A protein has these predicted regions:
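Sec-type signal peptide cleavage vicinity
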Residues: 2-304
Length: 304
């Protein structure tokens, strides 16, 4: 999977996935063998951008698709799925499905779940999730749910709208420095998040993420640098148990204690702006925003 660029944009594109006719149920004809799916990713997107600013998935990207009939509000077990983890890969500008997606019949409404990156999920109501700070692309998670449903109609070319949204949270830490560090500023050893949940369960039908409450599933982790010494960012499981961020410079820890735990929310970015002095860190603000908008800052202060 190629590294993605996070953009403040809305991406929409159509993809065609193969299907087969069901003559037994009256769905005949070679012209009726395709399901057209339109996809969009709301607000802050996880896609590539071209020189003109257009947004697309990249060649070779893949999504998992699940489909079922019956109750739209109940995530289906494996044996009840009409489509079970059909991998759709962007190949030469077209989405190729493996295995082919098949209509069950032309009577029942079909409901759909899309997952990016691809994932084989046995329990769609409580899928296991593990965060890996060293695999940011794989740890991000976008989910699309179509609960309106679609029935096959031989006389129409239907599209199945799949609107993907981020279900994980994102943390960004921006660092600035007092002039006592000089014009170039210091070299940061690391920026660490304290006592964060690294495992969770995901309900793919409702997009609800439940972090693990087990102590063994929590740990400190170092944030990847977007710009060394200046900006650090990471995917993080939605949770409300993290209270401290530590900046290490020259072996010395500067600890920001929020006083109360942060609330990292699904589909939102928490941005922490810190000004670092030699003896004290001052908090400029903390903002919480949707991926694609700005939030109101929460004022505060922090010390080493």
């Amino acid at each position: 999977m190629k590294k993605k660029t996070y953009l403040f944009a809305l991406m929409a594109m159509a993809l065609t996935l193969g299907s087969c006719s069901d003559n037994e149920n009256g769905i005949g004809g070679e012209t009726s063998k395709y399901i057209t799916v339109s996809t969009s990713i709301g607000n802050m997107t996880r896609v590539a951008t071209d020189e003109k600013g257009g947004q697309t998935f990249e060649e070779g990207d893949e999504i998992s698709v699940y489909a079922w009939t019956g109750d739209a509000t109940v995530a289906p077990e494996t044996r009840e799925r009409v489509v079970n983890n059909a991998i759709n890969k962007l190949t030469n500008g077209s989405w190729i499905s493996n295995p082919q997606m098949l209509w069950k019949n032309n009577r029942d409404k079909h409901y759909f779940i899309g997952v990016y990156p691809i994932s084989a999920i046995s329990d769609l109501s409580a899928g296991e999730y593990t965060f890996d700070v060293n695999k940011q692309t794989e740890s991000d998670l976008l989910v699309a749910v179509n609960k309106d449903g679609l029935s096959y109609n031989v006389d129409e070319q239907q599209t199945v709208p799949l609107i993907f949204t981020h279900v994980m949270a994102k943390l960004v830490v921006n660092l600035t420095y007092k002039n006592q560090w000089g014009t170039e500023g210091p070299t940061v050893d690391k920026v660490a998040v304290g006592n964060a949940a690294k495992k969770a369960t995901v309900n793919y039908l409702t997009k609800v993420v439940t972090p693990s409450a087990v102590a063994e599933d929590k740990a400190d982790f170092d944030m990847p640098a977007l710009t060394a010494n200046k900006q650090y960012a990471s995917i993080i499981i939605p949770q409300d148990g993290v209270q401290k961020i530590t900046i290490t410079i020259g072996g010395k820890d500067f600890i920001y204690d929020n006083g109360t735990p942060f609330k990292f929310e699904s589909g939102k970015i928490t941005t922490v702006n810190l000004e670092v002095g030699r003896d004290v860190i001052k908090l400029g603000d903390v903002s919480i925003s949707d991926w694609g908008s700005t939030g109101e800052p929460i004022k505060g202060e922090a010390y080493d």
